[in-house]
């Protein structure tokens, strides 16, 4: 190991994609894509291979120039060590400049090395199959390759890779908006022109009618003069046959005044010049339409907001009314259940009081009835009588009272459980 290799230290965390350096590289060749990029001094072809990191969604691309097969060492390092710091990348690029033969190209960014140096780096980075596939891939662009960019400096990353810019989408959106505005302006122009043409047609028709009336009046005047002049004027005014023929020939050659006026009117219909005030009208109509649309939108928004507020307030009032009604019903149910429970409890309390009184009375009567303790003689006991059978009266009465109290307690518990069940059953429908 040389001193340069000792001073070189690669990052510890590698891309898990590059595990086995002995894989077959032939399946990776179809994944390579060729692309032509336009530069100021001419087009250049690049071959790229997309290598994804299994631990992240950010892809990396290995790049190769088609003209000399040089490979981007920067893209190799970043793909092999995606979590490396900028200092580690700078140290590795410095080591490559000192120990390998980098190629300088001002058109692309990053550090590029020839194929032999790229294969040496691939061994260190454990990515030999990917570099072999990139070197063997064809440099002819496929039919589905991305289009070339107009400028190279803006469309390249620090790895020498063209960026996926969104300029195409923005330009398409701008074109669509321009087309829509142009269509709107054309429609407004058409409406205004139609209106103006209608007015001009009305004026032209009125002029035609006036000219026709003038022609008719001109025709009627000589007829009236002829009638007033009599036969003498008719004889004088009658032209000869030769004159009639000459006039007929001239009338055929030269158009009449009526024909000239109608032709002028038709020319005016065909060649109607656009007035310079049309642009002002178009602009004013467009501005009016935009202001009307904006006012309508604002009105609609205010109406929607007011309706939403009204609906929210109505829902809130209905919810409050419903909650108050439920609370009142629950209170009524609780009071009713409490009154129903209190009745059997009062009865039980009275029974307990009666039992206590009866127990006290029995105890007092037993105490009064029992004689004072006297020493009995042996003669009072029979010889064959069992001692255990001789139970005092006091003890038997107490046991009976205890058993009665026990059974009464059980009854009270049962009644309490029934009352609680009835109360819960009455409250649950109001809660759910």
UniProtKB/Swiss-Prot annotation:
At the top level of its lineage, which domain of life is listed? Eukaryota
State the Gene Ontology BP annotations: cell division; meiotic attachment of telomere to nuclear envelope; meiotic telomere clustering; meiotic telomere tethering at nuclear periphery; mitotic telomere tethering at nuclear periphery; telomere maintenance; telomere organization
Q: Where is the composition biased (Basic and acidic residues)?
A: 180-228
Segments of the chain annotated as binding DNA: 73-94
Q: Does the keyword DNA-binding apply?
A: yes
- Which cell locations does it reside in? Cytoplasm; Nucleus; Nucleus inner membrane
Q: Name one GO cellular component term.
A: membrane
Q: Where are the compositionally biased (Low complexity) regions?
A: 139-152, 163-172
Q: What topology in the membrane does the UniProt record assign?
A: Peripheral membrane protein
Q: What are the GO MF terms of this UniProt record?
A: DNA binding; telomere-nuclear envelope anchor activity
Which residue spans adopt a coiled-coil conformation according to this UniProt entry? none
Q: Where is the composition biased (Polar residues)?
A: 229-241
Q: Tell me the SUPFAM superfamilies matching this sequence.
A: DNA-binding domain of Mlu1-box binding protein MBP1 (SSF54616)
* Major location category of this protein: cytoplasm
Please provide the record's keywords in A-Z order. Answer: Cell cycle, Cell division, Chromosome partition, Cytoplasm, DNA-binding, Meiosis, Membrane, Nucleus
The signal sequence is: none
Q: Where is the HTH APSES-type domain?
A: 38-147
Stretches for region Disordered: 1-21, 139-283, 364-384
InterPro entries to which the protein is assigned, alphabetical: Bqt4, HTH_APSES_sf, KilA/APSES_HTH, Tscrpt_reg_HTH_APSES-type
- What exactly does this protein do? Connects telomeres to the nuclear envelop (NE) during both vegetative growth and meiosis. This connection ensures clustering of telomeres to the spindle pole body (SPB) when cells enter meiotic prophase.
Subunit composition and interactions = Interacts with rap1.
Q: What is this protein called?
A: Bouquet formation protein 4
- Name its species: Schizosaccharomyces pombe (strain 972 / ATCC 24843) (Fission yeast)
Higher taxonomy? Eukaryota, Fungi, Dikarya, Ascomycota, Taphrinomycotina
């Amino acid at each position: 190991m040389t001193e340069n290799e000792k001073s070189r230290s690669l990052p510890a965390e590698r891309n898990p994609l590059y595990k086995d350096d002995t894989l077959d590289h032939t399946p990776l060749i179809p994944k390579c894509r060729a692309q032509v990029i336009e530069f100021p001094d001419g087009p250049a072809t690049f071959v790229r291979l997309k290598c994804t990191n299994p631990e992240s969604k950010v892809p990396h691309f290995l790049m190769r120039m088609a003209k000399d097969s040089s490979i981007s060492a920067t893209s190799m390092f970043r793909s092999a060590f995606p979590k490396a710091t900028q200092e580690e990348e700078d140290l590795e690029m410095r080591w490559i400049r000192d120990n390998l033969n980098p190629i300088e190209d001002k058109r692309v960014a990053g550090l590029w090395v020839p194929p032999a140096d790229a294969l040496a780096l691939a061994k260190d980075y454990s990515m030999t199959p990917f570099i072999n596939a990139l070197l063997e891939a064809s440099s002819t662009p496929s039919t589905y390759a991305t289009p070339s960019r107009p400028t190279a400096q803006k469309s390249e990353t620090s790895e020498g890779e063209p960026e996926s810019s969104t300029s195409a989408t923005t330009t398409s959106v701008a074109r669509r908006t321009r087309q829509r505005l142009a269509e709107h302006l054309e429609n407004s122009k058409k409406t205004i022109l139609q209106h103006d043409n209608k007015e001009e047609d009305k004026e032209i028709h009125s002029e035609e009618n006036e000219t026709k009336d003038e022609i008719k009046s001109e025709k009627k005047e000589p007829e009236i003069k002829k009638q007033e002049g009599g036969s003498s004027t008719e004889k004088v005014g009658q032209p000869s046959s030769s004159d009639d023929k000459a006039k007929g020939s001239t009338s055929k050659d030269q158009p009449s005044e009526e024909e000239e006026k109608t032709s002028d009117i038709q020319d005016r219909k065909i060649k109607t010049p656009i007035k310079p005030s049309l642009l002002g009208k178009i602009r004013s109509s467009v501005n009016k339409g935009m202001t009307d649309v904006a006012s309508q939108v604002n009105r609609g928004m205010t109406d929607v907001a007011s309706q939403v507020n009204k609906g929210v307030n109505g829902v809130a009032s209905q919810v409050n009314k419903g909650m108050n009604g439920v609370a009142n019903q629950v209170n009524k149910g609780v009071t009713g259940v409490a009154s129903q429970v209190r009745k059997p409890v009062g009865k039980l309390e009275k029974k307990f009081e009666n039992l206590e009184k009866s127990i006290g009375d029995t105890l007092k009567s037993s105490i009064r009835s029992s004689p004072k303790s006297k020493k009995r003689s042996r003669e009072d006991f029979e010889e064959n009588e069992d001692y255990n059978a001789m139970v005092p009266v006091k003890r038997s009465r107490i046991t009976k009272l205890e058993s009665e109290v026990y059974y009464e307690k059980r009854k009270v518990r049962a009644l309490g459980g029934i009352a609680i069940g009835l109360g819960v059953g009455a409250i649950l429908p109001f809660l759910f």
